[in-house]
From Swiss-Prot:
This is Aconitate hydratase, mitochondrial. Catalyzes the isomerization of citrate to isocitrate via cis-aconitate, a step in the citric acid cycle. One of its GO terms (biological process) is tricarboxylic acid cycle. It comes from the Eukaryota. It comes from Schizosaccharomyces pombe (strain 972 / ATCC 24843) (Fission yeast). Substrate binds at residues 106, 199-201, 481, 486, 613, 676-677. It is found in: Mitochondrion. Residues 1-32 form a transit peptide. GO terms for cellular component: cytosol; mitochondrial matrix; mitochondrion.
Length: 789
């Protein structure tokens, strides 16, 4: 059988694999006091040490309390509990109070995180924090030119971030350094650690055995301010890998297959933990790829258990001391025999095919053997316009080496790309190493364009000129997301996510029907030839070339203030939101009843809007402009109930707010899936929103809404969504007795004058989160607590 799924709770021992792995380390007996060793967390933070002793001590307490076997991810999470003695621990129910080891922020989300941290009045961050400049570089002409233009265009933001980093003791990675997740893997991730990052693909570090979780900026501020971080205790989905990858099948195909099985919401509230003998055929960066795209199934995070490939990668990236220490510590966090998984999926790597997922959603999985048929059946555009490789998901040395091996075959046959072909190295280190070893030159000779070490087209930073907006076309990428209009702001672009290998092979045909496993191309002499499977080393044989030094350590110079021009269009100091007035909410308008898929890209678009991520007033002009209005089936066209005119969503919201009228947004399933951007929660709060009421939420967005003092609520009866008219007026009752587990009531006053009716609204607020709501936001609550002290 290709794959096996166990839907019911199941038990499966993973001890055989973990024990054989541990034997391969020939590790020494575990020291009685692990903390006797002082091993630096990174080469940039010599005075910040890995705290394995805390994990060991916490686990001794937790295991006695729970008296059951623990999975690898559970051991890491519970090893970071703030209070292991009194913490309630029940999967899917409890809220864990955790102490992460570090925080990572990308430049688009760091602006708001730092602005919030500044409001908290703290002198410096309490844990190691880094900021990475990767989101604001637009891809257009090529790496150096695009980078130079970005440095000019974004100077105000970069100067703000660098100055703030110096003031608050934060590490700063300049533009051109690379993508945050590749930088973290190369320099900061370590087995057994707990990382939070203000980007949804933070789980990439799970490829190095770290629990790494994407969060909103307000969550990051908690940790930066030395407060425990709260996470609903996740369930654990086990994915057992057997067999071995070979030929055209790559690590990317593992997660593409898993996405097809679990869908975009199947991992919600769970950690996906990989294990089994098949893990041994994966490189460390390949494991990172799989964990990275776990965000597309809604998973809290994904992780692989510590294994020899991780040790090899740590040593290759100049972290031998961490590798030695992790090997010594490995037995403590190895998954226990008969550890319990809430669901188990089995995948045989021997029979796994390359996949292409899409269009318009990353969980529409099609094996390559059936893709030609799917193109015809669904009338997808057959011509391949552009192939793009790179992104935080697939931009490692191994990824690029395999792609280059395909390009070399094409060069040897005298052919060049028929589709536009772009290459994005994941980091300056990867770029420099690929340049030294010749792979980038090979890809250029084949017709490729090398872009800057940044996110680029993956997040919509792409000045595309080969098609007009609205023109139906197909692209293939090695990225992670393919929501409508995400890459190029063209809703008619059909984007398919696959491996760098398949992307590279397909650009030489220019045809979506081309299958490199079975089909041939014509060489320069008109003879048929077929590509051989790609080859590439997991690690460079000559070691990594670090390239240019793009890291800026926290300044020893005292920075007294972080200046923000009050007339700036890109940066704006925050004004605290008003606290709750102590009453139930009456006479609320329905701003928009959103129909169908509504991701954070629909709620708060990226691309050209990224430049306003530090200016709440300006970026609020993109609220819900991509969402489909259930009333008329159109985007960004709403009826203003005060004037009767049709306007943009933000303009209607502003009109209601300025007239003192609060409003709600209605949505359907998995509302807010995708990016961790907290702007999707800040904007409705700024514009006068009171609640977002849906059939279900994506994890990060639900938390972000709570953090900003909004009410994320779900229909107890999903059919109520269909019954409500967008022109009705609603009340939210029960807030005066707001309590965990106690539903609220939505009272609907129909616009047609018919009798009012009511429906129950569920919520997941705990006691502390209710205090956020009452204070007006989590940041307000933090400030209040600080004043009391």
């Amino acid at each position: 059988m290709f794959c096996k799924i166990s839907r019911a709770p199941a038990r499966m021992g993973s001890r055989i694999f973990t024990q054989s792995t541990l034997r391969s380390f020939s590790c020494a007996p575990v020291a009685a006091n692990i903390d006797a060793k002082k091993v630096a967390m990174s080469n940039f933070e010599k005075n910040k040490f890995i705290n394995y002793q805390r994990i060991k001590d916490n686990l001794e307490i937790v295991k006695k309390r729970l008296n059951r076997p623990l999975t690898y991810s559970e051991k890491i999470l519970y090893g970071h509990l703030d209070d292991p003695v009194n913490q309630d621990i029940e999967r899917g129910v409890s809220y864990l109070k955790l102490r992460p080891d570090r925080v990572a922020c990308q430049d688009a989300t760091a602006q708001m995180a730092i602005l919030q941290f500044m409001s908290a009045g703290m002198p410096e961050v309490a844990v190691p924090v880094t900021v990475h400049c990767d989101h604001l570089i637009e891809a257009y002409e090529g790496g150096p030119i695009d980078l130079e233009r970005a440095n000019v265009t974004n100077k105000e933001v970069y100067d703000f971030l660098q100055t703030a980093c110096a003031k608050y003791n934060i590490g700063f990675w300049r533009p051109g350094s690379g993508i945050i997740h590749q930088i973290v893997l190369e320099n900061y991730a370590f087995p057994g650690g707990l990382l939070i990052g203000t980007d949804s693909h933070t789980p990439n570090a799970g490829g190095l055995g770290m629990v790494a979780i994407g969060v909103g900026g307000a969550d990051a501020v908690d940790v930066m301010a030395n407060l425990p971080w709260e996470l609903k205790c996740p369930k654990v989905i086990g994915v057992k890998l057997t067999g071995q990858l070979k030929g055209w099948t790559s690590p990317k195909d593992v997660i593409l297959k898993v996405a097809g099985i679990l869908t975009v919401k199947g991992g919600t509230g769970a950690i996906v933990e990989y294990f089994g003998p098949g893990v041994e055929s994966l490189s460390c960066t390949g494991m990172g790829t799989i964990c990275n795209m776990g965000a597309e199934i809604g998973a809290t995070t994904s992780i692989f258990p510590f294994n020899p490939r991780m040790s090899e990668y740590l040593r290759a990236t100049n972290r031998s001391a961490i590798a030695d220490y992790a090997e010594e510590f490995a037995p403590i966090i190895a998954a226990d025999e008969n550890a319990h998984y809430d669901q188990i999926i089995e995948i045989d790597l021997n029979t796994l095919e390359p996949h292409l997922n899409g269009p318009f959603t990353p969980d529409l999985a099609t094996p390559i053997s059936k893709f030609k048929e799917a193109v015809k059946k669904n009338d997808w555009p057959q011509e391949l316009k552009v192939g793009l490789i790179g992104s935080c998901t697939n931009s490692s040395y191994e990824d690029m080496s395999r792609a280059a091996s395909i390009c070399q075959q094409a060069i040897d046959k005298g052919i060049k790309t028929k589709s536009l072909f772009t290459i994005t190295p994941g980091s300056e280190q990867v770029r420099a190493t690929l340049t030294r070893d010749g792979q980038l030159d090979t890809m250029r000779k084949a017709g490729g364009i090398v872009l800057a070490n940044a996110c680029g087209p993956c997040i919509g930073q792409w000045k595309r000129t080969d098609v007009k907006k609205g023109e139906k076309n197909s692209i293939v990428t090695s990225y992670n997301r393919n929501f409508t209009g995400r890459n190029d702001a063209n809703p008619a672009t059909h984007a398919f996510v696959t491996s760098p290998d398949i992307v590279t092979a397909m650009v030489f045909s220019g045809d979506m029907n081309f299958n490199p496993l079975t089909d041939t191309l014509k060489d320069k002499d008109g003879n048929d030839f077929k590509f051989e499977p790609p080859t590439g080393a997991g690690l460079p044989s000559k070691g990594y070339d670090p390239g240019s030094n793009t890291y800026v350590a926290p300044s020893s110079v005292n920075v007294k203030d972080v200046a923000i021009d009050p007339h700036s269009k890109r940066l704006q100091r925050l004004t605290p939101f008003k606290k709750w007035d102590g009453k139930d909410m009456k006479g609320l308008k329905i701003l928009i009843k959103a129909k169908g898929k509504c991701t954070t890209d629909h709620i708060s678009a990226a691309g050209p809007w990224l430049k306003y991520r530090g200016h709440l007033q300006n970026i609020s002009n993109n609220y819900m402009i991509g969402a489909i209005n259930a009333e008329n089936g159109e985007a960004n066209k709403l009826k203003d109930q005060l004037t009767g005119e049709y306007k943009t969503v933000p303009n209607v919201a502003i009109d209601y707010r300025d007239h003192g009228i609060r409003w709600v947004t209605l949505g359907e399933q998995n509302f807010g899936e995708g990016s961790s951007r907290e702007h999707a929660a800040l904007e409705p709060r700024y514009l006068g929103g009171a609640a977002v009421i849906t059939k279900s939420f994506a994890r990060i967005h639900e938390t972000n809404l709570k953090k900003q003092g909004l009410l994320p609520l779900t229909f107890a009866d999903p059919a109520a969504y269909d019954k409500i008219s967008p022109f009705d007026t609603v009340d939210i009752d029960g807030l005066t007795t707001f309590a965990p587990g106690k539903p609220l009531t939505l009272v609907v006053h129909p616009a047609d004058g018919s009798a009012e009716w009511s429906t129950k609204l569920n919520h997941t607020f705990n006691k502390d989160q209710i205090e956020w709501f009452k204070a007006g936001s989590a940041l307000n609550h933090m400030a209040n607590m600080h004043k009391q002290k």
